[in-house]
Amino acid sequence: MYANMKREERDTRALIGSDQCVIDEQRFFLRGCLEVPILGSEEPFVWGLWVSVKEEVYDEVSDFWTLGREKLHGPYKGRLANSLTVYPETLNLKTEISLQPVGTRPLLKIGEADHLLAREQSAGISRARAMEVASLLLHQER
């Protein structure tokens, strides 16, 4: 949504930071990390993604981050706000949001078990698959 706005629209309709976004004072987004385990590796493949959330969730998470609270809340529910072109359509996939200590982006988990991304997140991917995804992404950006 934000990416499709003209610059003038962004300046008047959107308030965006590195981890939060509000559009038209009615649409609320949080940024999180979706980790896909790479089999045989300690490091996962990490997607930095936006999730749309209800205003109440946005406000509670904002308070948590702003006040530096120790107690983690959630998990929260949201909807993926990105289309990952290397997968079948991901826009609006149900997502679970788990807060991490302040200063760390929330972890995201896809809630629709039949989707390829959810299956890969649950079972992990081979190094070859991780390289394939990375290669597809690099070639798309050109």
Predicted features, each with a name:
Residues E25-Q26, E42, D63, E112:
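Intrinsic-disorder/low-complexity loop/linker signature
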Residues G32, L39-L84:
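Long, charge-rich C-terminal accessory regions
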Residues M1-L39:
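Basic, glycine-/proline-tolerant helical and adjacent loop/strand elements
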Residues F64-R142:
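C-terminal, charged low-complexity interaction regions
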Residues K6-R7, R13, R31, K54, ...:
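Context-gated lysine
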